[in-house]
């Protein structure tokens, strides 16, 4: 093994399962607009009846696509249009997990050799987390597999991350020391 055993929050290595690379394809105009934060195009597609739940090849819906690409405005538009806040992809990532993840994903900007974080506005992401909770997001949903975004961190020898199998939004917030979100999730029934 690579140092990871069982389900939970063990550090280090990739788990024995979940090594599938992302499958390419299945992108719709709505998914592209959500990924790029093209809010005007997104609004027009929604107005014309685009399917808010049609996923790409890995099961990622437009809402999850927006959140995983830090497009908070697009995510808010999709939620307000009625997107399912409890959908998940092949890896088990939900919109709530993604919002907590990107609120707390700090990494060095190796391209510019700068110690800056990932350009996430922590303050702006909190209202979106609250909105997801108001709309009934499952605070206890668990991830199932290691997402592709973590495989490259492993390749860069940055293994200071939590084993993703079985991780909840609360565990992700706890690992980052995000007590604000931890309290919020507990108030909404997190285990």
Model-found features: residue ranges?
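Ankyrin repeat A-helix N-terminal signature
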Residues: 2, 7-14, 20-21, 32-38, ...
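Ankyrin repeat domain, specifically the short helix-to-loop turn at the C-terminus of the second helix
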Residues: 43-51, 76-84, 130-138, 183-191
